Regions:
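Short beta-strand element of Class I
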Residues: 2-4
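Rossmann-fold dinucleotide-binding core
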Residues: 85-169
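Rossmann-like NAD(P)-binding element
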Residues: 6-21, 25-89, 95-100, 107, ...
Length: 172
């Protein structure tokens, strides 16, 4: 799956330096986060200052920054103008309120927003939770479930928008 990986711009060197280093590290970690080192070639580095135009070509945008509501909401405000009219935006939060995250999104994007929580380490953990917001379109969830099951090989459970969803509440 072709992927664009975002991070903050580097303070020194190339603007995408933080991501370039992260991609290089993916091929060195154990256990390996990628099934094949060659998969790193499908990852395009980008940063939040100069790379937001990349989002216009994305079908699925998964936000996975630190678990702070204010940071996530600030990021959504920043990227929303670059999300195309058919793209799905999902948060990989492990327990923040999906409806509260959706509150800052433009109305035309809210029906394409939900939570998708991959458990760590994602390559080795089979389960993913899908958490709809009250505004999420059912067809968006069905399409995301199909992608997660068929392309990523995950089992999917639907969770309600409650603190920590299902897995973290029961300690998975």
């Amino acid at each position: 799956v072709d992927t664009v990986l975002f991070d903050l711009p580097a303070k020194e060197g190339p603007a995408d330096g933080v991501v370039i280093k992260a991609i290089a590290n993916l091929t060195k970690l154990s256990p390996a986060p990628l099934a094949s080192k060659s998969y790193a070639e499908a990852i395009t580095p980008a940063n939040y200052e100069t790379g937001l135009e990349h989002l216009r070509d994305c079908d699925l945008i998964i936000e996975a920054i630190a678990e702070r509501m204010d940071w996530k909401q600030d990021l959504y405000k920043k990227i929303a103008p670059f999300v195309n009219d058919t793209a799905v935006l999902a948060s990989n939060t492990s327990g923040l309120g999906i409806n509260k995250l959706a509150d800052v999104l433009p109305e035309q994007l809210r029906h394409r927003f939900c939570g998708v929580h991959f458990f760590n380490p994602p390559r080795y953990m089979h389960l993913a939770e899908l958490i709809p917001a009250s505004t999420t379109d059912a067809a968006v969830l069905e399409g995301l479930e199909t992608f997660v099951v068929t392309h990523l090989g995950k089992g999917v459970v639907y969770a309600k928008d409650t603190p920590n969803f299902i897995g973290n509440r029961i300690g998975v």
